[in-house]
Structures are given as C-alpha cells and as structure tokens.
Amino acid sequence: MADDPSAADRNVEIWKIKKLIKSLEAARGNGTSMISLIIPPKDQISRVAKMLADEFGTASNIKSRVNRLSVLGAITSVQQRLKLYNKVPPNGLVVYCGTIVTEEGKEKKVNIDFEPFKPINTSLYLCDNKFHTEALTALLSDDSKFGFIVIDGSGALFGTLQGNTREVLHKFTVDLPKKHGRGGQSALRFARLRMEKRHNYVRKVAETAVQLFISGDKVNVAGLVLAGSADFKTELSQSDMFDQRLQSKVLKLVDISYGGENGFNQAIELSTEVLSNVKFIQEKKLIGRYFGEISQDTGKYCFGVEDTLKALEMGAVEILIVYENLDIMRYVLHCQGTEEEKILYLTPEQEKDKSHFTDKETGQEHELIESMPLLEWFANNYKKFGATLEIVTDKSQEGSQFVKGFGGIGGILRYRVDFQGMEYQGGDDEFFDLDDY
C-alpha cells in the first residue's frame, strides 16, 4: 500500500491510535476522576507541573470523599508520569490517567502516556467521567499531504493540502508572447521564439516542483494534482523534464477557470473525491499485487495463520498483510506438567472450546501467561522479522476477497517457499486450529 517503509510504519501507528481511541472512548468512571492532558510541542513541562499543583489544591476542596480521593489520586498519577520527561517531546505529549469501571463493575487504574506520531497542536486539561479523545481523532483525519501545481499562461502556483489546511509554497508569474498573425517573413521566427519561451516556462515549473515536492530523494506528498486552464498541465505531465518520481504520483489533471490562488481553491474542490480515495487505491494496488503472485503461482506468497507465521520465523516475509478487524487471539499458555510454553491462535468460535486450554492427558488446566489480539502482537513485533506491516480494510472488492477467501492474513514473500514440503521445526509447541479457513 505504501511505497516506502516509513509510510507503512505510519499506517501501523495510525492503527494503534485508532485502537487506543476506541478503548478510551468506551471507558467510563465514577465521578470526575478521569484526566485528559495534552501538551503541545513547544510547551514547558514546568508550566504544566505548576498547573497540576494548583489543580491539586483546588481538588482538595471537593465535598465528596470518594470523588476527592480518586481525583487527587489521578492528579498524582499524572504528576508522576510527567516526571519521566525532562522536556516535551518534539510531537507533543498525550497523557490519560484515571480510575475506570470495568464491565464486571470493578475499578481499574489506567495510566497512558505517549508521544503522537505527528505534532499535536492542541492544549487540553480536563477532569471528567470520560476520556476526551477529540484531539486524537482530529490527528488521524488529516494525515495525508497532497501537492498541487496550478499552471496557466500567466504563471504557476505550488501548494499543499493537508486535511483542511492549505498552504501556498511558491508562486511566480510569467509573460509569454501571444499568438499573432503579424511578422511577415519573421512569422516563423516569432512562432519559434514563442515555443522556446513556453518550453523554458514548463522546464522552470518542472524544476521548481522537484525542489518543493522532493526532499531527501523521496517524494514528500501522498499524491499530486496538476491544474490549469490551458494545455500546460498536460504538456507538463507528459514532458521528459518532469521528474519520473513526481510523474508516478500524479493523481488527476484538473481543468479550472482561473489561475493563482482562486485556481488553487477550485482545484481542491474538483479533486476532493480523488484525494479521499488515495488510501483506497493504494490498498487495491497492494492486494492486487498479492493476488498477482498467487495467480502466477510464483510461490512468493503465504496465507493463513500457520504458513504466515512459518514464513515470518524464516524472515521470508517482505510485506505482511492483515485485515484491520482480524478476530484471532494469540494465547501463551504454561503447561503445568511439562513446564513448557504453548502458543495458541484461536478465533472467537474456537475460544469457546475449553479443551484447547487443558492438558489432554492429565485434564489439568494450563496457566494463562498472556493473551492479546494477533494483529496487536504483529503491530508490536513485525520489525523483528524484517517485514513491513500493512493493515487493510474490507471496503474495496479486493480487500473483501482477501478477508473472505484468505482469512484476512497473508504475506508477499522475498523468495519462493514450499510450505507443503516443509515440516515445521517447532514440534508440538504451537497449535493452529484452522478449520474456519
């Protein structure tokens, strides 16, 4: 889905934050003891610490004893968390602390602090009976940055759009000679001069685009839109002078009635649909590549939990593709008799069968050491296997086919692997029950 690993890592970060938002939104507490604190990048830890000390004094006057103690406890937890930082991290700091009530009605303390994957320009401190995640949601909505080149006969404008923020990076005007019938014997020379000036103008636009949209040898925008009223945009997109890396990122050519800033606004309006589908298109491309490996029978693919984990262990997986709502859980169990660890991968249906958690010979129940969704385990560990993790949806036709036909888990491999002729080295310490696939 992403051409470079950094974009894939970013997608994993986004998925982690989405998951965090989901669990924070569902959490509820008694009273107002749930603290949401967001510190923007250039703020000072000392200022926030002083503000918390003042809040601590104010909270000491709360009438209800239970609420007072839980609020003071939450403020103390936040203060302890802040002591771990000398200064605010480059992207800001998000802290959630408080006592939540679980589904069983038990109280549970929550302490979360992390630096978001990109700058969060919001300052927030709230005590409430729920966590406030609006700023985090806003962080996700506008994650991709798109480049715009507005080019017509009077000048060119270069801009970017990220979420709702548009920015003009550079603009210049140009004075191109118009077509005319005068000149007599010099008419051809005039036409040649005019073509030469046009050519130089297109070259200048192409060179400026490289300076603005390529940094460190990589394109710094998710896609490019070329807009204009004449055929300059077509000329630019087909020109040899236009950098190949940028050419491959062109999403759309847009016809507009104006140049300059008005044209920029119009270009944004006319290309909103394309921009919102970029992730969708990247996903279709990725799964299309995966299906291509299967249809050509290259052997450079795997699907299902068992084969994918074998390939990961071998370091053969280049791109690990997992459905965002994969419902397989990973259990680490300790066998009482043999003192061995056993790892299970079960779907919700299989979890109901308690025989997976007991020793078949002795009937003893295994001790549960760890349980977490398999996707979460992948998100935490995929780098150890030298793979990039791509989390896909089932909204596209390809995505839906991948989830229904391949169980929502698979990978594109670096080299051919013959799974049939390979005996798994781990013996019986791993159990895969894949009847559902």
Curated annotation (Swiss-Prot):
4-hydroxylysine carried by residues: 63
GO annotation, cellular component aspect: cytoplasm
Q: Which keywords accompany this UniProt record?
A: Acetylation, Cytoplasm, Hydroxylation, Isopeptide bond, Methylation, Nonsense-mediated mRNA decay, Phosphoprotein, Protein biosynthesis, Ubl conjugation
Q: Where is this cross-link: Glycyl lysine isopeptide (Lys-Gly) (interchain with G-Cter in SUMO2)?
A: 87, 404
* Entry GO MF terms: translation release factor activity; translation termination factor activity
What does the PTM comment of the record read? Answer: Hydroxylation at Lys-63 by JMJD4 promotes its translational termination efficiency. Methylated at Gln-185 by N6AMT1.
Record motif NIKS motif, residues: 61-64
Alphabetized SUPFAM superfamilies for the sequence: L30e-like (SSF55315), N-terminal domain of eukaryotic peptide chain release factor subunit 1, ERF1 (SSF55481), Translational machinery components (SSF53137)
Q: N5-methylglutamine-modified residues are where?
A: 185
Explain the purpose of this protein: Component of the eRF1-eRF3-GTP ternary complex, a ternary complex that mediates translation termination in response to the termination codons. The eRF1-eRF3-GTP complex binds to a stop codon in the ribosomal A-site. ETF1/ERF1 is responsible for stop codon recognition and inducing hydrolysis of peptidyl-tRNA. Following GTP hydrolysis, eRF3 (GSPT1/ERF3A or GSPT2/ERF3B) dissociates, permitting ETF1/eRF1 to accommodate fully in the A-site, followed by hydrolysis of peptidyl-tRNA.
Instruction: Say which family it is in.
Output: Belongs to the eukaryotic release factor 1 family.
State how it assembles.
Component of the eRF1-eRF3-GTP ternary complex, composed of ETF1/ERF1 and eRF3 (GSPT1/ERF3A or GSPT2/ERF3B) and GTP. Component of the transient SURF (SMG1-UPF1-eRF1-eRF3) complex. Interacts with JMJD4. The ETF1-GSPT1 complex interacts with JMJD4.
Q: What is this protein called?
A: Eukaryotic peptide chain release factor subunit 1
